[in-house]
């Protein structure tokens, strides 16, 4: 348990940040899951919109410091490869 006043405040701030970061990660995972489901269904019309949404969420997480930029780049690259494979098929 924190002994200093500033440490007690930081515990509250960390708890709030943790909730916000969990929300952002969850939103991003949901967007990725939706994109993968659309790719599996073979829906070429909605796949571009879903990809933009997933990519946007990943970039937002990077800008807020929730995930590392290399992690986001890797995920975007892999998703983009799946989208391109669907579009050419």
Swiss-Prot record:
The GO terms describing molecular function are: small ribosomal subunit rRNA binding; structural constituent of ribosome
Print the keywords alphabetically.
Ribonucleoprotein, Ribosomal protein, RNA-binding, rRNA-binding
Q: Does the keyword RNA-binding apply?
A: yes
The record's Pfam families line, in alphabetical order, gives: Ribosomal_S20p
GO CC term, one of those recorded: small ribosomal subunit
The record's section on NCBIfam families has: S20
| Purpose of the protein | Binds directly to 16S ribosomal RNA.
Q: What is this protein called?
A: Small ribosomal subunit protein bS20
Species source reads Wolbachia pipientis subsp. Culex pipiens (strain wPip)
Give the gene symbol.
rpsT
């Amino acid at each position: 348990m924190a002994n200093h006043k500033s440490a007690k405040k930081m515990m509250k701030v960390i708890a709030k940040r943790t909730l916000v970061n969990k929300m952002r990660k969850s939103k991003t995972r949901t967007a990725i899951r939706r994109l993968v489901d659309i790719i599996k269904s073979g829906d070429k019309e909605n796949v571009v919109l879903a990809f933009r949404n997933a990519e946007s969420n990943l970039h937002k997480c990077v800008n807020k410091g929730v995930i590392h930029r290399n992690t986001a780049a890797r995920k975007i690259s892999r998703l983009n490869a799946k989208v391109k494979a669907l579009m050419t098929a």
